[in-house]
Amino acid sequence: PYTSERAKDKVKELAKIVGRYTEKITLYVVPFTEIQMDIIEKCREDELTIIMRRFMMRVACELSERKKIQSITTGESIGQVASQTMEGLMVSNDVSDRPVFRPLIAMDKEDIMDIARDIDTYETSILPYEDCCTIFVPKHPKTKPRVKDMIIAERKLDIEALVNKAIDEMETFI
């Protein structure tokens, strides 16, 4: 309910464009609102983003397991947003059971925008539709999270049930 159909259409269009450069692309759209609402209700505001990112990694790992995919690739770049610090990436990685590739990791925003223009994703990517990462942004996100603190914070959440329900309710687009 928090992410519009237009936002979903934007992601589908981006996948279609990126698909021109790959053999085959399958888009999995995972409903994240219930996870976010549970995190917001039970965790500290400054930890929302990193706990949400840990859930995204868990969902990606579980989906990878079910689909027999050996690795995860993300679009993260050091320092581009508060959660993409070295500490934030390490805390996110902590829940992954497979390699995580980050081809944009050392690029700055201008480099990434140049690539987006080159592959024709830029104009679509800047469309102003809110997504799950922009709606629930804390005022002061934690930039130096620690694994042990996140493990303690996450004890309040039913991680396995939330991850499984999200994957069970996902939509698949080919």
Locations of the language-model features?
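ATP-dependent adenylation/nucleotidyltransferase module used to activate substrates
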Residues: 1-118
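Peripheral terminal appendages
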Residues: 25, 85, 89-98, 119-174
